[in-house]
Amino acid sequence: MRASMFLALAGLVLLFVVCYASESEEKEFPRELLFKFFAVDDFKGEERACKGVFDACTPGKNECCPNRVCSDKHKWCKWKL
């Protein structure tokens, strides 16, 4: 009887420790996600040699990346079909 009570108590303590550890990881996840987002956002300031899909362009100037063309109607780069 005494051994089963000890095992039950040890199991509850172990369950508490596991739940606490997973909860603390969940609290850190949004913070890590924001840090990663802003770290990637720093690279967006660099100028590219060509323009990607949906970037503004001037028709006839060939500013878009390969396999893309500047739309005369919308004035942005789109996939060449």
Curated annotation (Swiss-Prot):
Effect of residue 49 to Y: No decrease in bioactivity
Positions of the propeptide segment: 22-48
Chief site of localization: secreted
Keyword annotations from UniProtKB, A to Z: Calcium channel impairing toxin, Disulfide bond, Ion channel impairing toxin, Knottin, Neurotoxin, Postsynaptic neurotoxin, Presynaptic neurotoxin, Secreted, Signal, Toxin, Voltage-gated calcium channel impairing toxin, Voltage-gated sodium channel impairing toxin
Disulphide bridges, residue numbers: 50-65, 57-70, 64-77
Record bears the keyword Transmembrane helix: no
GO cellular component: extracellular region; host cell postsynaptic membrane; host cell presynaptic membrane
GO molecular function: calcium channel regulator activity; ion channel inhibitor activity; sodium channel regulator activity; toxin activity
Matching InterPro entries: Huwentoxin-1, Huwentoxin_CS1
Domain notes: The presence of a 'disulfide through disulfide knot' structurally defines this protein as a knottin.
Function: Lethal toxin with multiple biological activities. Inhibits voltage-gated TTX-sensitive sodium channels in DRG neurons (IC(50)=55 nM) and also shows activity when directly tested on Nav1.7/SCN9A (IC(50)=25.1-630 nM). Inhibits N-type calcium channels (Cav2.2/CACNA1B (IC(50)=100 nM)). Also blocks neuromuscular transmission. In vivo, intrathecal injected toxin shows analgesic activity in the rat formalin-induced pain model, without induction of motor dysfunction in rats.
Protein name: Mu/omega-theraphotoxin-Hs1a
The organism of origin for this protein: Cyriopagopus schmidti
Lineage: Eukaryota, Metazoa, Ecdysozoa, Arthropoda, Chelicerata
